[in-house]
Amino acid sequence: MRVSPPSSLVRALLLGLPLVRGQATYGENYLSVSRDSEIVSRAFPELEDIELLSPAFTNPDTLPAGWRNGTEGPTSDTELDYFYRNLADRNDWLTYQAADFRSEEGRSIPYLFLSDADSTARNVTKLKVYIQAAIHGNEPAADQSVAALLGKLDRNQTFTAALLERLDIKILPRYNPDGVSYFQRALACNLDGNREHIKLARQQSRDIKQVFMDYNPHISIDMHEFTAPTIYGGNYQPGADALISGGINPNIHPDIRDLLLDGFIPFIGSNLVANGLRWEPYVTGTSNSTPGSLIKLESALEYARANFDIVLSTIESARADFISSNADIVVTDYYTRTNRTFTLVPVDFFETTPSVANLTRARPEAYLIPRTWFDVVAKLRNFGLEVQELDYEYRGTVEALNITSSVLEDVIYEGTVLNSVTTSSFEREVSLPSGSFLVSTRQKNAGLAFIALEPENIDSFVAFNIIPLERGDEYPIFRILS
């Protein structure tokens, strides 16, 4: 029997939460609820043909009291954990995996692993998919869509068997349980988990990154929900049901970017349209719904399954080509502005896929890091990079960078003051003691080293003052050229 959620619940999941109450406090940094007008609500009718088999929809009695006023999420940790454990108990293809670490406030962080034991036993080659949701605690459509996906897979075993014949799927259903508990965007420490991917300032971020890198997926999907009622130009409220983005970093292999932009994203978009939903490329300030998010998840998995050979061969060959490439790397870039129609109105749209490089540099064979900076090396290893610890004194010619300008921001951003630098390069002889480190760029995760270790990059260790520098300083990480 199909369970239809009450209309008030669906509207609630489409609520925008646009205004912060004030300066950050410890916990309870939820946002003010802004309900859509009746005119706007009528433009987002319920989708009667889509089953949402997550606890908030199948059992509305589990909704906490604070849900309607925007102070609590729709499903508690206890309720969601019970839901996933029950699914795992009755399905051999689903394994509940308790992480060996906890959130900042000590909440459990479970993973779910989906795999068909028979195809695994036959040593069938599979695509490895990673899905995470709710890195922002006040975006309920994210983890609700994951729960709805699991509910559908439990209900439709034929669909599940077809997927898992070619895919293994690891899911982090709730990245930020502390944020969900407080119904706030940030981690308990008030840093944004989605700005932690390179700087890795928090232990929870490092733990989750390690699991991701150890799994080593071919495809990763990050589920979000976007604020609905933001007004632009005085009276324009965006009307897209779903936003999709991927392949942004300019050092991503073009074949992988093309696979996303010409394959996955159009397929997902066509399925959204077929179900009566509107979609756009990602821009800030619009909405995302649980039905739309479920369709996106299903579509991504279905595209990967249906195009298994193309997807696998493209990713594997692109990885090999990236490792052996001698092309310059992109250090900084900018976005191109085009005028396009965005759900009925023309807007200036800054395209990020692809962006345009405005600073490139020869790809080094390796980065040479003095043993003094062992804490930097720990982060690099957390990225899945292989780092060699030298058991000999290193002597040789390297490319060094001198800081020619340094501009500090006048506000604190994500726990630090950002430092924008420029550099000039020169060659010099170095002598570094045994115990220093060498990071080869002939590995598939080298793109993360380019982001972190090229000082001009907006997310580099220099930008975030992990390596603090000022004008006239020599950058203490050296480049070994071909």
Q: Where do the language-model regions lie?
A:
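Structured catalytic-domain cores with a bias toward divalent-metal coordination
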Residues: R2-S8, L19-S482
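Sec-dependent N-terminal signal peptides
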Residues: R11-G16
